[in-house]
Curated annotation (Swiss-Prot):
One of its GO terms (biological process) is isopentenyl diphosphate biosynthetic process, methylerythritol 4-phosphate pathway involved in terpenoid biosynthetic process. SUPFAM superfamilies: 1-deoxy-D-xylulose-5-phosphate reductoisomerase, C-terminal domain, Glyceraldehyde-3-phosphate dehydrogenase-like, C-terminal domain, NAD(P)-binding Rossmann-fold domains. 1-deoxy-D-xylulose 5-phosphate binds at residues 125, 151-152, 176, 199, 212, 217-218, 221. Coiled coil: none annotated. The lineage of its organism: Bacteria, Bacillati, Bacillota, Clostridia, Eubacteriales. It catalyses: 2-C-methyl-D-erythritol 4-phosphate + NADP(+) = 1-deoxy-D-xylulose 5-phosphate + NADPH + H(+). Pathway: Isoprenoid biosynthesis; isopentenyl diphosphate biosynthesis via DXP pathway; isopentenyl diphosphate from 1-deoxy-D-xylulose 5-phosphate: step 1/6. This is 1-deoxy-D-xylulose 5-phosphate reductoisomerase. Belongs to the DXR family. Its cofactor is Mg(2+); Mn(2+). Its EC number is 1.1.1.267. It holds the Pfam family DXPR_C.
Amino acid sequence: MKNITILGATGSIGTQTLDVIRKGNEELKLVAISANKSYKKVIEIIKEFKPKYAVLMEENAFKIVEDFCVDSKIDTKVLKGMEGMIYISTLEEINTVVTSVVGMIGLVPTIKAIESGKDIALANKETLVVAGELVISKAKEHNVNILPVDSEHGAIFQCLRGNKKEEVKNIIVTASGGPFRGKKKEELIDVKPEHALKHPKWNMGRKISIDSATLMNKGLEVIEAHFLFGVDYENIKVVVHPQSIVHSMVEYKDGSVIAQMATPDMKLPIQYALNYPNRKESQIEPLDFYKISNLTFEKPDMDTFLPLKLAYEAGKKGGVMPAILNGANEVAVDLFLKGKIEFLQIGDLLQECMNKFYKSMEATLENVISVDKEVREYLGKKYDI
């Protein structure tokens, strides 16, 4: 029996993780959850799974859920805020913490969970992007597994198993290309949020959908891959693969390329991470090669999709530069969704902040949090948010 905490239980990954646990043949037990303010969803989760703990970040949502548990005589203990997230991430009985919250908010609870010896099923890209060196070193120190919960890194993880790191030539990260694959800059001038949110293959949250449209999502994954697998940026390639059947590949020095293929369904990497090192009966539709008919691969357009190019630059620069990139992107995506900037301005803001805020300093937790705050305050004042 594995005891699970889910940080971000009401989002896209969190919801699919619940589905995996639901069908987990009683080998997976949900002990604790966190959410921002989706109290209705939290109450439904409490009714079904009866977790010992539930954490809400927003005050009003916390009170509503707490009152529900008291009135319903349910034993779930309701906690609030970052302190609550850290508490449920470090519980002695927990085996694995699923970090599926979006953004920098996942960083501190993840580090605390690692320090408490918990395996991390990592769906929060920002944690490794802004503090990858710190996270990986702590994971090694505490003998903790960092298990990637996304299709690309989950695929790479599987393609590397049983092989020697020194035999790897390139890691090849596949990208669907998002809703604007094949478009040129001039065709993206009038893009609205509703257009960018329509992903052709994956059902995702709003922030990650915009990141997919700008290819920033793939840029963040490149930085993640660098830290997760210890591979230089020159040896991490991005290939656009619109069918989303090949989830990523590893090229070895002898010319062999090992690919992981499956029906595009996030439940597979979630199930693999939660049950690692074992494989369980599939919860997804089997791959039918007769229906696929063809698989295509293209080179990404880094001039049109500037954020991908900037992610490579930020990763190579190192230090706090990935934190600057990430902080600026989180704010820029929010500004775009609120109609305060145009789609193509997202990349421009990233470039502006990278030029303005870069300092040659180590990516310690304190430095990362400090520079992230500077970037957010600057953009907040600039756009009056």
